[in-house]
Amino acid sequence: METRCLYLLLVCVLSVNHATADNGSIKKMKMQYTGFPLLKFQICVSUGYRRVFEEYTRVLTQRYPDIRIEGENFLPQPLYRHIASFLSVFKLVVIGLIILGKNPFTYLHIETPGIWLWAQENKIYACTMVFFLSNMIENQCMSTGAFEVTLNDVPVWSKLQSGHLPSMQQLVQILENEMKLSVHMDSLPHRRA
């Protein structure tokens, strides 16, 4: 009975996974053939660039109604993501051990450090300190400072390379130049080889 339930669960998971994979490829195909330019922003959400992206999107949508605009979080390198994930779990374990009054050093046959004894005597301060210190390190690991802009998968602006955000005028000028260039390239006669 148990194996039948596991088999049924496995079949359900695989069918849902297959259905979502097909749906994603159909959506991607539909978006490929819309013909409208795609302006894509990759931003550091933890750096506070979401508002800048929303403001730019609002202005650019009014000025260029035919442009599709997408935004996504620019992820840090995998090493930093793994460090941040580890810290988020590790801090909860440490806070749990402090609250429960458990001493993990006795299991490791290590002498208990003085800071652990202090944490056991001052649980609220210790838990608060562990929480905020860990969050600070996690945020530092996840912050990329990125504000990358591509038009039809061609990079048009990179804060990581330039060191600053584009102004609205700069972004509009770049878009107009790229649009003129693409219209000019489309109007050239095609040569046959």
Swiss-Prot record:
May contain a selenide-sulfide bond between Cys-44 and Sec-47. This bond is speculated to serve as redox-active pair. It is found in: Endoplasmic reticulum membrane. It comes from the Eukaryota. Disulfide bonds: none annotated. InterPro entries: Selenoprotein_Rdx-typ (IPR011893), Selenoprotein_T (IPR019389), Thioredoxin-like_sf (IPR036249). It is an enzyme of class 1 (oxidoreductase). One of its GO terms (cellular component) is endoplasmic reticulum membrane. There is a cross-link at C44-U47 (Cysteinyl-selenocysteine (Cys-Sec)). GO terms for biological process: cell redox homeostasis. One of its GO terms (molecular function) is thioredoxin-disulfide reductase (NADPH) activity. The keyword Oxidoreductase applies. Residues 1-21 form the signal peptide. Keywords: Endoplasmic reticulum, Membrane, NADP, Oxidoreductase, Redox-active center, Selenocysteine, Signal. It catalyses: [thioredoxin]-dithiol + NADP(+) = [thioredoxin]-disulfide + NADPH + H(+). It holds the Pfam family Rdx. The keyword rRNA-binding does not apply. Its EC number is 1.8.1.9. Widely expressed in the embryo. High level in embryonic blood at 24 hours post-fertilization (hpf). PANTHER family: SELENOPROTEIN T, THIOREDOXIN REDUCTASE-LIKE SELENOPROTEIN T1A-RELATED. Selenoprotein with thioredoxin reductase-like oxidoreductase activity. Belongs to the SelWTH family. Selenoprotein T subfamily. This is Thioredoxin reductase-like selenoprotein T1b. It comes from Danio rerio (Zebrafish).
